[in-house]
């Protein structure tokens, strides 16, 4: 069989192996093939295209006209549509490659992002109205400060997150990324280490939970990420946020803390766990027993990192890191970073991306007052504040466990509802108090500094320092319990003669101003 016949078998009539063009051996089925036309010279620089001739089997002139009207323009239109689709695909590919060139980090993960983008781009055509099916919570119309509103205008969709994760984000009540989330999420998704410093109540939890959940593979039943927190209450709160954000994902979240049944935790770890949230001591204990296997854990998050790197926790964390793979990613978040953080960063973080959104340490939306009182006048002053202020919920801080219990008893005797919580309580009792106060079962909570770290209760608009804190760092975290996520709050400090020097020192170290309390406090500064 010769090449000409092979060409005729492989290619359509009139097209040879070298491309479009007449085949000299091709015999047309049309007995009257169209003759080459001589182009007439005209004013137009380009020759007119020859019109197609209708086949001989079309007998009438009307049939021939319909053939030309239907066939020829339709071919032109199909070619134009094909060219437009090719141009659009080329533009999308160029945009993706330009975006890819700007992203630092692991190229393999960027490939995964590109595949996710392409797959979701295909599904977008069929699911353009997916947001219409969301069960959104009531919109929070309270005033917000620039801490959370001064954003770059990004949307959560800009980070190419999983559709089911986006559903959880929006149904959680997140509308747009806060400044710390805008800075952290895209960097964390590239696999880089992060050292982030941001104010209390500006969305740090979402800044590390969202990229952590995005990078977890639900099909791989191993522990892929660990979130470390310094307190049991913060562990419960963080795990609850993770569960709410991932409710449409098949991600198993486990929380483990000291004070709970070790046997129950061991039994739970025999089931699939993708994300582990807990305190360092308990997780280290489980890892030493060989029950908590961390060899596939590629992500370690440290919330309230300054507290985690204190003398109390740092040895446990350094020992725990030895159970992680060498290619781990570490994310550190806090409002303050002492010297110990820098030494830890130099030893364990690999070229970390530094984020510092702390132009001012104290929150912009919290108004701070002080009242000079004698020790024996404090309870009477507190009673006056309760009667004068419009309190949604308040947290009252004392410096010792005994003073917490005594003050809670006094407040109850005055006729106000009150809970108290401190570190010496049984863990089940602490959990119940925390849960009930968060759900609004009581208006006032008396506690020690145990409750200063990361606890997020949106209804709290008043913080009262019954005892002035011993350090400026503790003051910062106490005040941060009000004015959450840019909302307005009020902090009142009951200051004795012995406390005045600590208050002045706190003002200097934090660069803030604590004003004397006026006779009448405008509700607009803490109730909007």
Curated annotation (Swiss-Prot):
Entry keyword Transmembrane helix: no
Positions of region (Disordered): 1-80
EC number: 3.6.4.13
Domain Helicase ATP-binding, residue spans: 185-355
Task performed by this protein: ATP-dependent RNA helicase involved in mRNA turnover, and more specifically in mRNA decapping.
Domain notes: The Q motif is unique to and characteristic of the DEAD box family of RNA helicases and controls ATP binding and hydrolysis.
Protein name per UniProt: DEAD-box ATP-dependent RNA helicase 6
Source organism: Arabidopsis thaliana (Mouse-ear cress)
């Amino acid at each position: 069989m010769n090449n000409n016949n092979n060409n005729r078998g492989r290619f359509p009539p009139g097209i040879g192996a070298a491309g479009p063009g007449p085949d000299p051996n091709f015999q047309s089925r049309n007995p009257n093939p169209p003759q080459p036309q001589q182009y007439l010279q005209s004013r137009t620089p380009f020759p007119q295209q020859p019109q197609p001739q209708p086949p001989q089997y079309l007998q009438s002139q009307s049939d021939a006209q319909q053939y030309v009207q239907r066939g020829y323009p339709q071919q032109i239109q199909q070619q134009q549509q094909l060219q437009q689709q090719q141009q659009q695909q080329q533009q999308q590919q160029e945009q993706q490659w330009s975006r890819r060139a700007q992203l630092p980090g692991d190229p393999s993960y960027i490939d995964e992002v590109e595949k996710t983008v392409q797959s979701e781009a295909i599904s977008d055509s069929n699911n353009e109205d997916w947001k219409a099916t969301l069960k959104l919570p009531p919109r929070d119309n309270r005033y917000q400060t620039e801490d959370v509103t001064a954003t770059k205008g990004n949307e959560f969709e800009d980070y190419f997150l999983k559709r089911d994760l986006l559903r959880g984000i929006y149904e959680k009540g997140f509308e747009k990324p806060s400044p710390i989330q805008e800075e952290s999420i895209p960097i964390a998704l590239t696999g880089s280490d992060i050292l982030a410093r941001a104010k209390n109540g500006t969305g740090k939890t979402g800044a590390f939970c969202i990229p952590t959940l995005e990078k977890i593979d639900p099909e791989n039943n191993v522990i892929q990420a660990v979130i470390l927190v310094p307190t049991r209450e913060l562990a419960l709160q963080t795990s609850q946020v993770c569960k709410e954000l991932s409710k449409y994902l098949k991600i198993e979240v486990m929380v483990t803390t000291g004070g709970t049944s070790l046997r129950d935790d061991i039994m739970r770890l025999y089931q699939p766990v993708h994300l582990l949230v807990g305190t360092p001591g308990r997780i280290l204990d489980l890892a030493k027993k060989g029950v908590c296997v961390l060899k596939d854990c590629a992500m370690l998050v440290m919330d309230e990192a300054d507290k985690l790197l204190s003398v109390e926790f740092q040895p446990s964390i350094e020992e725990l890191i030895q159970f992680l793979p060498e290619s781990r990613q570490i994310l550190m978040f806090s409002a303050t970073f002492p010297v110990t953080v820098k030494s830890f960063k130099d030893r364990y973080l690999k070229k970390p991306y530094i984020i510092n959104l702390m132009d001012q340490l104290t929150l912009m939306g919290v108004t701070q007052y002080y009242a000079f009182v004698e020790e024996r006048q404090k309870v009477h002053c507190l009673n006056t504040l309760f009667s004068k202020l419009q309190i949604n919920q308040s947290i009252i801080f004392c410096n010792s466990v005994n003073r917490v219990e005594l003050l809670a008893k006094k407040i109850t005797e005055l006729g106000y509802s009150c809970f108290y919580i401190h570190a010496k309580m049984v863990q089940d009792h602490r959990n119940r108090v925390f849960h009930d106060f968060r759900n609004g079962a009581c208006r006032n909570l008396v506690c020690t500094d145990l409750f200063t770290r990361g606890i997020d209760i949106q209804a709290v608009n008043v913080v009262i320092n019954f005892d002035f804190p011993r350090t400026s760092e503790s003051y910062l975290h106490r005040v941060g319990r009000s004015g959450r996520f840019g909302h307005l709050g009020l902090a009142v400090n009951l200051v004795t003669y012995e406390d005045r020097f600590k208050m002045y020192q706190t003002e200097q170290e934090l660069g803030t101003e604590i004003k004397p309390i006026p006779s009448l406090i405008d509700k607009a500064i803490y109730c909007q």
